[in-house]
Each structure stands twice: as structure tokens, then as C-alpha cells.
């Protein structure tokens, strides 16, 4: 089935493509445009976010018309009394949707309309069917009773001649009425469809027609027998009689109307808000007869009073307000009021009942409600989980003493603080669970694939062996002896600084067996690499130098292997040296749980010498025996490849080169793969010797070309059916990693520390850009540098890291952020050095990792603000006080220790107590001459400025602040 495109989904959901793209981005999906295709799970999520619509709005009109279709329409037997005014504007729109009238009725309506102005007096007792002669305009309708109160439901047609002829407004034509439409005809003829637009019906002569009063509670035709001739309940209305409205033969207020045939009775009613009765145009006030409508000046009557209830005929209905039309459109009732949905009512109730924190209402949990959040989530993500307003969560967080924005990535500690306040248990999804959920969204379940593999599809695979140990214990040289190569000669400083993967063949018991070796660094900075090597291996070979013994990295490698639950083979190296002691090594490793077989344990120890090529075959035999005896190594070759990226680097001619280890399946040239945030199609594969490989089977390490970027060492890779799927997985992984990094870098600023940070100024920060030859070395260097701690005054921040030569973009970034570029086994590209010199960017290059660590640590210490300490200069005893009107009190003193310096800091001590601190020696004289300093054993005169509280026997101590060297 073809995958849907964004614009197709937008059309299906009744939204624009821009809204669909925006919603997909909110859901974490990245699409390039409206023509991009999306996966079925993504389309399902979008359909859930936007329920399919498009028919709901048009369906409202037929629903509104439904009651009117079953009501009998009046027969247009007579004309409207004398209506000659300009055509009504609203009628033109309705006429287009009205049915054509009968051919025989149209001439009658036209003839009746022409005779209407000739009428001079109302015709009493004339039947509606014979209403060709109508009353003259302006004739008072004093004897006409008011139509009775409306009752819901269909009404019977009034009998002909039941009402006296009286000029009355036509129902359903009031522009201010809440509902428009015609009621039943007086002739009793039933009409199944809407009233023809070109036909006019005759009104009841001599009586005002209902449905035309803008102040009436109910609009529409009323039953003819509901209130004929009888007095209105409650007595006549005050205000005097009212003559027939002058607008009966002319235009009515609000919407001018001509004597043209009425149109559009079956069409939709005019929309727009209903005006207030107080805004209606004024009407002539006169004495109204019994049963007539009240004058506007008398004011509308509220429901519950006389004339307000059903049957009262006038005023407002008992339920108050202008109501819906009864009679003309079936069942009537009170005015149409917008009813809130149950969901809206529930949300309002929750908001009203939610406790207020910091002045805002936020939904609270019961203390056991679990909320799962991804790494680097923001307050918007948390608000979406608990159905709250993100701005309210910002207010709550400020109330708790934390400052953050709605879209800022927060760490787990901040979410735990917020969750504890609101009654939620926050669970931040681990990277493994996040990766599994990401793949499941693309219908990729690695665990289910492993469980579905049967014995018939499994095939034996070679063991993967990781060589681990302390630095300079001979791991790489041992591999050189196994492979008959000289890899160690190419290592800087003689130490391995990246992972190497090789596959060799050896003959064991007459059979050729393949073994895959992974060489890991032994330096302490490469802890992550050793842990990564232990995770992908089947057997660990622990190399220990016989002359050096067990070292810290030996114990660390041992712990990594035991944590990964892999069997260990110990290779005691350098046994050819005179001071070698293999038995000592066996005894030391026994303390860590590795008991040799000769001591009754289950760990194989082999004494080897990589330099002398001693016992290499015995070591290979031990590896194969361990694999056959303790492990059952099988994999499925007939499926999409799965594996791990061992190492990656950026080659100048070939681009991103990634060394991958296939764990299951078969990787072929042309497959679409994704490794971490890198994706692409396999263009070529090479083995460790540089030979071309067409297909890589399980446990085979190969170099892959064709990835978009350089993945990180340790990223898992998998082959997909389509490159589009690989790209989407990579983009989601990149977004998740970016959010996690932002949350990790966020410096928590509390309200208490905010003022202090502003007062102290910005904290000194050393920005670094790290470029290396391989991604594993860059990762190790970054981790080691971030562990340097010289105090809170100076911070280290890595603003960019990458693989490959230093480019102009790196220099430009360093210029903007005042950063230092560190190159690890790389050199700058062409003309980059000149640009760096011109911009004043410092670049440092290293080939050994611990040299870079030492220099960066020294630079950080140099950025520390100096510390000062108080150093005592000397003391002087006051032996006599000289009082001067010009200079104040002068102390005649004898220097007992050190020296007294002019303008130095001083304090006055009396009987062992400090009388005054932070004094300054303003004047210092030796006899009558000014002196800069006076040393021990001499007398002098000391003036302490404006401080005159000195006595004989007081001690003057002088001191100064000196910079203290930082450790």
C-alpha cells in the first residue's frame, strides 16, 4: 500500500498542509514539505490529533431545516395587503433556493397585489380564501383579538372565516426575529415542500399577524382557534390603544420590502446576531385594544407575569428572553442557547477544583500517578502529559525557586522537584527504552526478531574477542604477533588511542576457524571504549605484563568484562623478561575471582611473549576451546543486518568511514543503513587489509562508506528496507540526543543565586572546539576534559566536536564564541591557519591524549581569579601622644617589629582588643622629615588621619594583602 503524503492527509482531515506539517513537528516527526510521505504510524498519530471533519459544518443547515419540512405550509390564496416598497435584500438569496410556485397561483398573487392599494376599509368577517380585497393601510385594528398563545408541535389549519379581516404583518419576515419562517396557511392546504418564492399568502384581515413583532417571545404563526375574540388574560395592557402600524402598506423598520412576491420561504434564515429590543426603532404610542401587542414605551414584560406565559400571547415567555419560533418550524422553545460539551464542563470542573500553586491552578496527581518523559523534555511536554497549561507550570516552577522557559530542556532533577510538588511520579525514559520505543514506532522490534528466530535459520558464527588490559602491557603487540603485522609502529606515543577490529583464521584440530579480534586502548581516558568493547564481545582476553603485575586499568577492564558476563582468558605477557613472575600474576588475579585451572578454577591462563612470538598458538587454542565449551555462538544470516559501530573517522577522499561489526544478518553493498544520527546507502565495504567486500556475514568487521556524517563509536546500526526510513530514524535520534545534551548543559539558576550571579558578573568560561581523527578519541578526550574540576569560578564548555581536519567553519565558530581549537591527530585545512591568525583564534595540536589534558587543566587554573591573604608588615608601640590643632592627634611610636610603611593598612590594638580596623597611615615622619617607611628599632611619628582615639601604650599593627598562589 502506498504511503500517504502530507497534503493528502491534510485534505482528508480538512486542514491546510502547513497546519499538518506544524502538527507533525510538534509530534516529533520531521517532514520536508507537503509532498513528503509519512509512515502509517505517523499518519495514524496525525489522524488522532486531527479528527476527520469537513461534514460537520454543512450538516447544520439541513438539520435546521428538518422541523420545517413536516409542517403544513399555508396556501397562498391571497395577496399581502398593499405592500409596495423596495425589494427586500435578504429575499434574493433565499429565492435561489426556493421551489418554483405553481403556475396557476402566480397570476392570482400578482392580481391581488395590484388591487391592494385600492382598498379603503377593513373587511370584517371575510374568509382568508376570498382576501382579494384588503384593508387600507393605516386602518386601526381595534376589534381584532390577539392570536392565542403558541403551543409546541404542529397546529391545525384555522378554518376559513374564523378571524375578522385585519391588516397584519406577515410572519417570518421580521429581520430582528431570532427565527424566520412561515407558519400554517389559513386555507388549511398542506404543503410538503417549502413555500414558493414567487407566491404571497394573504394575511388575516384586520388583525396583526404573529411572527412580526420584534419584542415577542415567540415568532411564527399561531393556531387560529387558540385565542379568538376573547380578552387577553390579565386585562388590557397599559399605554392606550395602538393603531395599525403604518408600515403595513410600506416598508417595515430594519428591512425595506416591496410588494413583489415573497421569495425564499424554504431557504435558510438570515444569520447574524439579534439586536436588543431597546435598539428597535420607535413606534407610535396609542391606546391598544384588548388582545393587541403592547407599545414599545410600555416595556417588555418578563415571563411569569400576565401575558408572559403560554397562552398569554404577548410579552416574553415564562423562561425569559426571546425564544425560538413555534408553529412555523415545529416544536418551539426558549431561545437557542449554546450548550457546553461534557468535556468542556469536566475541564472547567477540574480547573475549579485544582489546587492553586503560586497563584495558578494546575491539575494534581494522587501521588502514585506515573508520568514518563523522554530525556531533555520541556515543560510543554510535561504539560501535555497532565493536560495543563505550560505557562502555569512555569509559574509553579518559579514558585519553587527554579527559573525555566516553556521550551527549555530540563534535567531529571528539576522534573522530580516539580512532580513532587504536583503529586506525580516522574520517570525519565532511559536511552535504551527510548531507542526501543523509537524503533517500535517504525515497526522494528529487535527483541521480537530474536525470539522469532528458530533453530532452522540459525548458523554458527565466529567468536568476537576483545583484548583488554593496562597501558603498555603489550596488547597491540600481541595482536601484531597474531596477525604478523606492525600496527604498533603507527601509534602515537606507542599507545593505542582508537579501537581496531580484525578477523584472522587459525587452524584448530585440522579445521580452519575464524576469530574476530577487537583491540581497545588501555589508557585511563578510554574507559568508555573499554566498556563498549566488553559489550559487543563474546570472549575477553585480559593481557597482564608478567614484570608489572595487576594495574588500575587491569582491574577496570576486568570489571567491565565481568559486568558484561563474558568469559575471560588471561594472557600473561612479557614472560621472556628476566624479572617476569607469572605465578605472582596468578596469585594477584585470584583476589579478583579469576582462579587458574591449575589451581582448581575455571579460568585459562596462557604465558605468552609477543616480542618472541611465544605460545601464540596456545592462546588461540584456548580462545577456541572457551568459545566451544562455554558459548553457543549462532546467528541468522538471512535477514537485514544488525550490529554496532566500532569506530568511525572522516577520510579526506572517501568521506565518512565507519568500522562496523555485524552481529546478525548480512550487510550488502547497496543496503540502506542508519548508525546513530548518520544514515545512508552502503557504497562500498572493505576489510582490515583494504580488500573489497561484497557481503559481510555475522561477526565480520568491515569498513563502510556512504554515511551522511560520522557516527559515534558504539552506536548501533541496522539496515532498513528504504532509505527514507533510515533518514527519519536518524533525524529522531539526533533530536533526542540534542535535547538530552541541552538538559545536561543547563545550569540551574535559582532565584537566590540569580541576584548573586548578576552582582558578581559573568563566570569565566573556557570554550573548546575538539577535532580528532576518529570519533572514539574525540569522545574520550571530551569526557576527560569535562572531568577537570578547578572550582566553580571557571567552567569548561565544549561547544563543538567533530572528526576530520580543522576547517574555516571551526575558526568562524571559535571567533564568535572566543573558543580555543584543540586538534587531536589532525591538522588544519588549506588557508585555515592564515584565517585563525587573522581572527586571533588559538589552535593547539596534540598526538597524545594526556598532554592535551594537562595543558587544558593548566589553562583553567590560569583563568582562576587570584586569592589574597593578609600579611603582617610590622608593629609599633605608642609611647607619647602629641596633640595638634592642625593635624589632630599624632602618635609618637617606637617600631618594635618589621616596618611601618606610609599609606599602609593599619589597625589599633588596646589591651589585646582591636579598637579600630581598616585604618590608613596618612602621615609618617622621622624627626621633622617625611619618611616612606620606618624599620624596626627606630622612633617615628604616625598620623592616622581623622582617627584621634589613641592612648599611650596602644599598639599599631600594619599589614597588606598579597596574592596567594592557587593550587
Swiss-Prot record:
Residues 34-363 are annotated as: Disordered. Keywords: Cytoplasm, GTP-binding, Initiation factor, Nucleotide-binding, Protein biosynthesis. Pfam families: EF-G_D2 (PF22042), GTP_EFTU (PF00009), IF-2 (PF11987), IF2_N (PF04760). Its main location: cytoplasm. Residues 469-476 are annotated as: G1. One of its GO terms (cellular component) is cytosol. InterPro entries: EF-G-like_DII (IPR053905), IF2_II (IPR044145), IF2_N (IPR006847), P-loop_NTPase (IPR027417), Small_GTP-bd (IPR005225), T_Tr_GTP-bd_dom (IPR000795), TF_IF2_bacterial-like (IPR000178), TIF_IF2 (IPR015760). One of its GO terms (molecular function) is GTP binding. Residues 184-196, 300-333 have a biased composition (Gly residues). PROSITE patterns: G_TR_2, IF2. Residues 609-611 are annotated as: G5. Residues 51-96, 103-154, 197-206 have a biased composition (Low complexity). CDD domains: IF2_eIF5B, IF2_mtIF2_II, mtIF2_IVc. Residues 573-576 are annotated as: G4. It comes from the Bacteria. NCBIfam families: IF-2, small_GTP. Belongs to the TRAFAC class translation factor GTPase superfamily. Classic translation factor GTPase family. IF-2 subfamily. This is Translation initiation factor IF-2. It comes from Kocuria rhizophila (strain ATCC 9341 / DSM 348 / NBRC 103217 / DC2201). The gene is infB.
